[in-house]
Amino acid sequence: MTVVVCLFPVYWMISTAFKPSKDIQSADPQLFPHTWTLTHFQRAVDADGFALFWRNSILVTLGAVLLALLVALGAAFAVARMRWKGRRQFMLMVFIAQMAPWESLIIPVYIISRDTDMLDRLPTLTLIYFMITLPFTIVVLRGFIGTIPPELEEAAQVDGCTRTGAFWRVAMPLLAPGLMATSLFGFITAWNEFAYANFLIIKQQDNRTLPVWLSSFQNTFGTDWGATMAASTLFALPALVIFLLLQRHVTSGFAAGAVKG
């Protein structure tokens, strides 16, 4: 029953995207479309800025995910494999940052962006999404590295590898599930984020991302529900496809990352 309740809005979105406008506005809602149409998808694809905003979202999302993986991998390795003063305090700050409601920082972030002339710029969104996803990525990768026996890297060092070389040649292949799990989390977080994108992109409307673009189907004359649902369906496809492709790795990655996280 819980699954049905959770999935019904998704089903309703997809089914509405294929219904003719007269059926959408009917006083007698239909659970299953009796007549199928692709008109709403055509209208969504033909909307102003469709390709441009897809490009913006892809650039911002991939940039944030790759940057978070790079920084988090170094931080997780340092915490899991090295002993240094302040290590526990560092992880405490990471946990606090992970639990922090990032929406509460939107005003300070806006002021900083305004004063540094970073408003209306895609790199600003990339950095913000990077900071939002970084704590979680560090926690999961740290737990995952902790499950890899250090003896494997030590054996590689005995064979002539440097410490860094041993990590890249031995540990990195074993980290694949953890990297995929955190990548998926970062992708979904950055791909779906609306508040910062809507608040920080003010004048340069060509720098908007897809979540903000979806609101363009609402105007003073009402909402084009067919096109909105079609655009929302297209918007949800990348995250859904990536999740289905990586589902097995994601499950094992989160499970392993939670062991010593």
Segments the model singles out, each with a brief description of its role:
Residues 1-261:
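A structural signal for multi-pass alpha-helical bundles of membrane permease subunits
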